[in-house]
Amino acid sequence: MYLINVLSLIIPILLAVAFLTLLERKILGYMQLRKGPNIVGPYGLLQPIADAIKLFIKEPLRPATSSKLMFTLAPTLALTLALSLWIPIPMPYPLVNLNLGVLFILAMSSLAVYSILWSGWASNSKYALIGALRAVAQTISYEVTLAIILLSIMMTNGSFTLSTLTTTQEHMWLIFPLWPLAMMWFISTLAETNRAPFDLTEGESELVSGFNVEYAAGPFALFFLAEYANIIMMNALTAILFFGAMHNPMFPELHTLNLITKTLILTMMFLWVRASYPRFRYDQLMHLLWKSFLPLTLALCMLHVSAPATFAGVPPHM
């Protein structure tokens, strides 16, 4: 694999993340009846560049009592994993066409828990540690439903390869037959990416800023990039799973445009949710998953496993 292939994937993602921060600030501004960033460049369009320069020229301070190696390693690991999640995403062709692309995404997103845990523990601050423990409990819990929902979709798809979902959804998007799963998937992705109303890890009122409270400058920017790269990746995955983009081999660009548009609409929904809803209480968050989502997803998964056999039909690609 050539370096240019990897760079042509990473650079657009980082640019998308930069402008997503601007989009978020603008949308939140207009929803709160104010302008948002509008000084740097025309309509504030150069604000992300100014933010990046400001963050990376500041001195990265490290608490005297922190664990030096882990403190530095955690943000690096977070961004590396966030970018590696994009490897099997078909846009329309993935960087590496993995046979078990879905399992790869699940494994990588599970590993991201370590970066949060290390950052909280290495900071040697009680606020950071409480934030990290909350984040880990939340991420691990919601990954259970994400995995079960993915399994149900793969049963319908008949293969663990993400590229085949385009063929499966040629005649009908999977959101129509699987709409209860799609609703739970969307809410679980909100929780998985620590977004409002599930941003308990960053509860400013009680935890100052969450697991990254001791981070400043460059390392903080890496966490920030990782979080937003994960948001875009989750939305791209949602678009692929439930809103399969039409793929014409003659015009692969159309597939990319289609996917980008759907991802953007879903990302706008993430921002809309953030502007509209208050934060959940921690026990409500856990009850929602273990008492509502888990039994429902398990029942629907059983249905999708048994339905093809019951009706003597076979899923496509079997």
Curated annotation (Swiss-Prot):
It is a multi-pass membrane protein. GO terms for biological process: mitochondrial electron transport, NADH to ubiquinone; mitochondrial respiratory chain complex I assembly. It catalyses: a ubiquinone + NADH + 5 H(+)(in) = a ubiquinol + NAD(+) + 4 H(+)(out). The keyword Mitochondrion applies. Its main location: mitochondrion. GO terms for cellular component: mitochondrial inner membrane; respiratory chain complex I. One of its GO terms (molecular function) is NADH dehydrogenase (ubiquinone) activity. InterPro entries: NADH_UbQ_OxRdtase_su1/FPO, NADH_UbQ_OxRdtase_su1_CS. PROSITE patterns: COMPLEX1_ND1_1, COMPLEX1_ND1_2. Keywords: Electron transport, Membrane, Mitochondrion, Mitochondrion inner membrane, NAD, Respiratory chain, Translocase, Transmembrane, Transmembrane helix, Transport, Ubiquinone. It comes from the Eukaryota. The keyword Electron transport applies. Its EC number is 7.1.1.2. The chain crosses the membrane at residues 3-23, 69-89, 100-120, 135-155, 171-191, 223-243, 253-273, 293-313. Pfam families: NADHdh. It is found in: Mitochondrion inner membrane. Belongs to the complex I subunit 1 family. HAMAP family: NDH1_NuoH. Core subunit of the mitochondrial membrane respiratory chain NADH dehydrogenase (Complex I) that is believed to belong to the minimal assembly required for catalysis. Complex I functions in the transfer of electrons from NADH to the respiratory chain. The immediate electron acceptor for the enzyme is believed to be ubiquinone. This is NADH-ubiquinone oxidoreductase chain 1. It comes from Dasypus novemcinctus (Nine-banded armadillo).
